[in-house]
Amino acid sequence: AADALLDSSSPDPPSGADGLLLLADGTRYRGRLFGAPVIAEGELVFTTGMTGYQESLTDPSFAGQILTFTWPLLGNYGVHSGASESAGVWPRGVVCRQLMEVPDHRDSIGSVHDLLFAHGVPGIQEIDTRELTRRVREHGTVLCIFGPAEAEREMLVRLDEMTPPDAEDLVAEVTCDEAVIINPGAVDKEGKPLPRLAAIDCGVKHNILRELAQRFEVVWCPATTTFDEILKWEPDSFFASNGPGDPAHSGAATTARDSLAAAVRAGLPVMGICLGHQLMGLAAGLRTYKLRYGHRGANQPVVDLETGRVYITSQNHGFAVEDPDKGMLAPHPSGACSARGRNELEAPFKVRYVNANDRTVEGLDLIGKRAFTIQYHPEACP
């Protein structure tokens, strides 16, 4: 896990090091640096969670991004063994109002500064995150860079030459290396073998795998694994996980989408969450598009259109599936979206869930197939 790399020899936060955060729109903020002594660049996003910062920092869905925490204090209870969602820290940089440099919890094994330093990730504090978040909400996510104030000239050049992380094959960066059964021979309470599920890893979190392993014998597969290769494991069902980046990217995500579509056509049970939901939407012939500022936090309300019930969900995504009737809701000013394709699933579908805030699509049901999707993270871990 990410916390396994904590090193008590990491230097104290450089309290006197002046930092500079530069946005592509020309806005600048001054603060103090912590974490690794390197320059960070990426897409500026924010998360509204009040706790769960360790889980967010180790969530592969944040790959390629500069993560702003809207809650004004970061690191109060330190870093805990077993709380990480992957083996890495995935944001390329962290922005906060105030860092708790000496955490206060009996089970803490280190600080956020220690965790970031161990993984080569920088942070900047004393930023007006309230104003910064309002700017992102009003104008959309934006490219940014931060580092030592004396490196301003270098950072301006790099910011001018920066390409959006969405253009990168981020799924290939975060997926596992090879297929493996994580709980071989798993049985239920009566000793009967559990059904086998192929979990396509687009950036899956550990808590999702743990939940699946309580119900299935799980084959953990790289996103680059083809449908025919997965079939060699003789799965009873398919699952596609959360993950970072543009679902329409022509890399590992495309291979995962093709595997899902083939599984649906073969009549196998299929579930997609977060990026997996978006890949299924693309396979259904819908467009995916970039949201103005995305949904990132543990308090996103989702409406079940069949029952009228509202669920408070944990989410982390910057893209959405278009509504087949209403089109693209809450889009990014850039207008970034995929082309509309054909329905590769060979089945009609309906929108089952929508976001109560902006009415964007939060889940699809495939009619006549054992397949469905949800945009949120059902294990409810930030």
Kindly give the residue locations of the regions a language model identified.
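Cysteine-nucleophile active-site neighborhood
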Residues: K232, S237, N242-D323
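Residues that mark the start of a beta-strand
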Residues: L194-A198, E217, P269, I312, ...
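Active-site-proximal beta-strand elements of phosphoester/diester hydrolases
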Residues: R196-D201, T313-S314, F372-Y376
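A glycine-centered loop/beta-turn motif at secondary-structure junctions
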Residues: G363-P382
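RNA-binding accessory domains that recognize and position tRNA/RNA substrates
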Residues: A1-W233, G245, T254-T255, E379-P382
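Proline-centered loop/turn at the N-terminus of a beta-strand
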Residues: P122, R196, P269-M271, R287, ...
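Catalytic beta-strand/loop cores that center a nucleophilic Ser/Cys/Thr
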Residues: R309-G368
